[in-house]
Amino acid sequence: MTTRTSPAPAGLLRPSLHCLAFAVALGSAGAALAKDVTWEDIANDDKTTGDVLQYGMGTHAQRWSPLKQVNADNVFKLTPAWSYSFGDEKQRGQESQAIVSDGVIYVTASYSRLFALDAKTGKRLWTYNHRLPDDIRPCCDVVNRGAAIYGDKVFFGTLDASVVALNKNTGKVVWKKKFADHGAGYTMTGAPTIVKDGKTGKVLLIHGSSGDEFGVVGRLFARDPDTGEEIWMRPFVEGHMGRLNGKDSTVTGDVKAPSWPDDRNSPTGKVESWSHGGGAPWQSASFDAETNTIIVGAGNPGPWNTWARTAKGGNPHDYDSLYTSGQVGVDPSSGEVKWFYQHTPNDAWDFSGNNELVLFDYKAKDGKIVKATAHADRNGFFYVVDRSNGKLQNAFPFVDNITWASHIDLKTGRPVEREGQRPPLPEPGQKHGKAVEVSPPFLGGKNWNPMAYSQDTGLFYVPANHWKEDYWTEEVSYTKGSAYLGMGFRIKRMYDDHVGSLRAMDPVSGKVVWEHKEHLPLWAGVLATAGNLVFTGTGDGYFKAFDAKSGKELWKFQTGSGIVSPPITWEQDGEQYLGVTVGYGGAVPLWGGDMADLTRPVAQGGSFWVFKLPSWDNRTASR
């Protein structure tokens, strides 16, 4: 039984960080002929099958492919085409979604590494290994979730709070920008996003920051992809100042920040937590070109302790901790907030709001079509929000036994909380408050691992988990570089027969159409295809395929280590390929209490696997 009340020390997360940044070019003559990636290529990523150019497999992040050469009738013949090992002792969690461009796979790995591989053979073309300092502060393993590509460059973030642009053909550094102090806990784990501002016509590189568990102020950035120069920065704590073209622009929300308590004895006039209030947008953004809006999740407030963000003797419901634990619509021209919807006001449970925002056409019960976002939150509720204005359209639970709220009020958009679910402060003379049993726990009904949406079935395929936690308050004060939580916890089982639950959800009725249970937590993303298939990976190392309509398991392959990444698919030379990054790690083994014990037997790893139908059997591959 394991109890953790703070992130694992940085030194425990890495065998060695004395590595040189380098690029090894192998076969650069052929790579030099590769075409540049245009905005039109990226805008049509979800419709074209030869490349995968965006995190989410398109600007709408649906993770749906029109490919159907591999289908429910022949997937049982799916066979490994090749695998590539990331090598050396640097394993840990491998959460990367690969991208594919012009026959080259770009896949990031733990410890801020990036590999370019021949998509057909797995031959390494080049490697970039970022030099990391000893004092990085990753909360949840040394992961990286992917890269972006545009023009002749590939971009990714690093654990020392930097963004790097590499020549996509050679791996050589084009530019490198530091955006924050890694010693204070800032990192970058999410894949950047490429968007085109509909007003100015400029193509922008959008990225966020990580570090809410260390008391950072979350920030979203826009950069010139050619030079790396910052165009704007938007903080996600109310009352903090943004930047535009290198100068102060506007504060986020109300300059007086009424959603955070005042403190007349503080130099800022606000409580300590306001200066370290979190809200980090550490996942990748989606982009709605029709309304010219960047849509991204905002992280949990800092600290986790609700009473540190509530006036003494006050009610947490009077202090929402804006703009945290919600989804934000941002103007790409200026970085101004266009709209905000908060999933968990004054979030007391580290539910965050960073899970992906999937853009889709929502057909309401009255037949009206709404251009919407879909979001399965860590708090256990599934949200459908009008992406033109941030107004709630529908909300329902997607996991069992939610304790903290009974439902979401569709008129007010706010949760209806249950009494006693905000853990109380310690009694006088006590270090810890009374523990409360909460579900979902802070790791969520679903965490960062992205769901998929099928344009054929109209269903969302959600990689959920059933678990709970004992949760209690502790004393908290800010120290640079130290965990800023004010809470203790122990995660526990909910059911004896499973933790993971892959669920097909109807976004209109809120009903579970089918469910597949897994013994271990699900931490991999999901892919849906026109072949009536759904793919995901499991904690015990299986890459699996399911019938999208019935949920029947049709195929599986043991990769040798747990899978905690989103799969992809593409077409090359008339053949459909599927790829997935393999290597167990991430937050569960570090923070997961009883769940960490459950997953301890899983071997670590670091590799990329590619599958296809046997070439000799493409014409006859059917039952």
UniProtKB/Swiss-Prot annotation:
Its cofactor is pyrroloquinoline quinone; Ca(2+). Binds 1 PQQ group non-covalently per subunit. PQQ is embedded between the ring structure formed from a disulfide bridge between adjacent cysteines Cys-139 and Cys-140 and the indole ring of Trp-282. GO terms for cellular component: membrane; outer membrane-bounded periplasmic space. It is an enzyme of class 1 (oxidoreductase). Ca(2+) 1 binds at residues 45, 48, 51. Pyrroloquinoline quinone binds at residues 95, 145, 189, 207-209, 378, 523, 587. One of its GO terms (molecular function) is calcium ion binding. Keywords: Calcium, Disulfide bond, Metal-binding, Oxidoreductase, Periplasm, PQQ, Signal. Belongs to the bacterial PQQ dehydrogenase family. Homodimer. Interacts with cytochrome c550. This is Quinoprotein ethanol dehydrogenase. It comes from Pseudomonas aeruginosa (strain ATCC 15692 / DSM 22644 / CIP 104116 / JCM 14847 / LMG 12228 / 1C / PRS 101 / PAO1).
